[in-house]
Structure formats: structure tokens, C-alpha cells
């Protein structure tokens, strides 16, 4: 189990297995605890200074948790989109409710749209209420401009060309096989802020 959510940990603990990796549920305290080899992942998540010192992508960290070596493998998406590329550029502006501070301000998105003008076709984020529609929309974009969000990870799995906008999260943790990362020009002491 590679998820720290207590309910997911409790569910995975109920599965009969001879070897476990990742996290387990502590019923006495109601929190996630680490199995052997996973303690450093909790430290990355809980301690900002440790997080800054860790210079690995999450893929590499997760592979290590299960005793394997990451060799640049990308994500596998269990969904096969049916859409064709329709738009030159997709603007993935919404980050969801969990981390609103990851969002690039809307006025910047509008300014970027004006700068691009009519040179390329632009599509604004679609499928906000339906994950299948969201996959299809991402697949319909040739280049994907996105905040650090679920859409970024889906676009990576779909092998899209990506321009990723980072703010409060640590860009070095995210593996983007085909794209670039844009970071704040100033090095803020708080980054990573999440």
C-alpha cells in the first residue's frame, strides 16, 4: 500500500498477504505508519528540510519502497482514450479543492491566451465533473499547459508535450518525460510549501 490515507491503510491491512510494503494503519492512534523501508517516505512528507534534501522523483522513491530500482519508467494509465488530437494547446487551469494554492492566477491564463492570439487553437480545461471526459480532453491536446495537478500526471501517462507551472510544490519530485517545468524566479524559503 503506497497511500498514507488511514482508510486505505486499514483496507489494505485487511488483505491477507505474506509481505507488505508501504504503509499500514495504527488502530490505536488512527494514523498511517510505515512498514520496513518506508519510513524515509513519511519523513519526506512530514519534514520540509528532509523533503528539500531528497533529490529524487516520486517514481524512484516508490520503486525503492517495494525493493525495486526505477529506470525511468513512466506511468501506466489503465484507460485508453478514443479522442484524436484536436487542439494545439490545452489550458489545464483548475487544480481542484485540495491544494488551491497550486493554481496559477486566472488573469495570467487570460494574458497567456492573448499572447498566443490566433496562432494556435486553444482549449480550456474540460471534463471537470467527469474523469473519462477529462482523459479524453487531455488526449485531444497536442501541447498541455498545466499547474501541478492530477492533469499533469495524466498528461505524462498519455505522453503529452507538457509545459508545467510550479509554485508551492517541489518541481524536482515530479518526473516529466516530455516537457519543461517553469518555476518561480525567486527562490522562496517556504518551497516546498505543501
Identify the meaning behind each predicted range.
Residues 1-194:
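Catalytic machinery of carbohydrate-active enzymes
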Amino acid at each position: 500500500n503506497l497511500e498514507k490515507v488511514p482508510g486505505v491503510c486499514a483496507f489494505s491491512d485487511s488483505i491477507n498477504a505474506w509481505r507488505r510494503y508501504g504503509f499500514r494503519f495504527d488502530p490505536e492512534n488512527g494514523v498511517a505508519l510505515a512498514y520496513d523501508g518506508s519510513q524515509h517516505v513519511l519523513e519526506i512528507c512530514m519534514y520540509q528540510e528532509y523533503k528539500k534534501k531528497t533529490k529524487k522523483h516520486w517514481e524512484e522513491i516508490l520503486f525503492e519502497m517495494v525493493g525495486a530500482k526505477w529506470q525511468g519508467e513512466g506511468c501506466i494509465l489503465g484507460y485508453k482514450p478514443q479522442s484524436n488530437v484536436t487542439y494545439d494547446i490545452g489550458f489545464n487551469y483548475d487544480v481542484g479543492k485540495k491544494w488551491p494554492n497550486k493554481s496559477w492566477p486566472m488573469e495570467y491564463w487570460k494574458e497567456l491566451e492573448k499572447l498566443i492570439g490566433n496562432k494556435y487553437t486553444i482549449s480550456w480545461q474540460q471534463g471537470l465533473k467527469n474523469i473519462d471526459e477529462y482523459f479524453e480532453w487531455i488526449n485531444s491536446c497536442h501541447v498541455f499547459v498545466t499547474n501541478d495537478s492530477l492533469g499533469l500526471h495524466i498528461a505524462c501517462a498519455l505522453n503529452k508535450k507538457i509545459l508545467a507551472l510550479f509554485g508551492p510544490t517541489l518541481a524536482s519530485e515530479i518526473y516529466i518525460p516530455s516537457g519543461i517545468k517553469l518555476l518561480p524566479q525567486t527562490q522562496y524559503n517556504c518551497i516546498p510549501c505543501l
